[in-house]
Amino acid sequence: MDTIGGMSESPYPTFPGVEAFDAVRTPEAERVHRKRMCALGYRIFGAMRWGQLGDGHISARDPILTDHFWLLDWGIPFANATVDGLVLVEPDGRVVDADGNPTGAVNTAGYNIHAPVLAARPDAVSAAHTHTQWGTPWSANVAPFRAISQESCAFVFDQSLFDDEEVEVLSYDGGKRIAAALGDSKLCILRNHGLLTAGGSVEEAVGWFVMAERVAEVHVKAPDGVAISDTAAGVAAATLAPASTGWRLFQWLLRSVVDDPSIVD
């Protein structure tokens, strides 16, 4: 099921004062938007107490230099992320500021994972990965999610497994193998490592990641849970799996865990 390229009719109302899920912007305005959402995504992860060991990253493809992407500068805690704290990563891994001047650094694995994933997925704007309390333990089972909860239905028809022992991604080739495993799905469970999500917007990738973590928790706590039928899961997926749902999850997370979104500006 393609959740990046399309959207089914949503049964949910819009959010007052928020641009529509499918809003069209100029490239310059889109760059501003993606960077802001990326910084807020890191804030959401920080509020979840993720990334406190420097593990994890959220990328945002630049809409002007489309083979470049934004990551949080090395050494900045997720909970302190700002738009100005993001740096631009060139295809060869060189880190520059918005004017192209060398600056900062990024998590090495961040480049090795996100560069090949975004290169392999021109439909994806963002990818998200960090080590979490439930996603990492579940990944050690080397098994996909089953339809044992409502949220699981967002992924059961749109997930993949990276069955490899390369838990420390020290090479670009390692990232290419992850990209190949991800394929065109929105979730890849990385063996003994954790979760990786991709989306057609930063909001979508972050929303999917947080939901996938909740699904992983259910799987760890109810490993023998009885799954609903594929037919029933498909009915639920019709509204839970579209890209607009990942975006909507982000809106709720922003309202729930970030007291003042302007803090990233």
Regions flagged by a language model, labelled:
Residues 114, 135, 175-179, 209:
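A general structural signal for well-ordered alpha-helical packing
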Residues 160-196:
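A contiguous binding-surface segment within folded domains or other stable secondary-structure elements
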Residues 133-174:
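Class I SAM-dependent methyltransferase SAM-binding "motif I" and its flanking Rossmann-like core
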Residues 60, 117, 131, 178, ...:
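Divalent metal-coordination and catalytic microenvironments
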Residues 60, 69-72, 161-163, 189-190, ...:
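Short hydrophobic-aromatic micro-motifs
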Residues 21, 28, 35-128, 135-146, ...:
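An anion-binding catalytic pocket shared by soluble metabolic enzymes
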Residues 76, 132-135, 142-143, 166-168, ...:
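Short acidic/polar capping segments at secondary-structure boundaries
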Residues 4-41, 184-265:
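A conserved C-terminal secondary-structure "cap"
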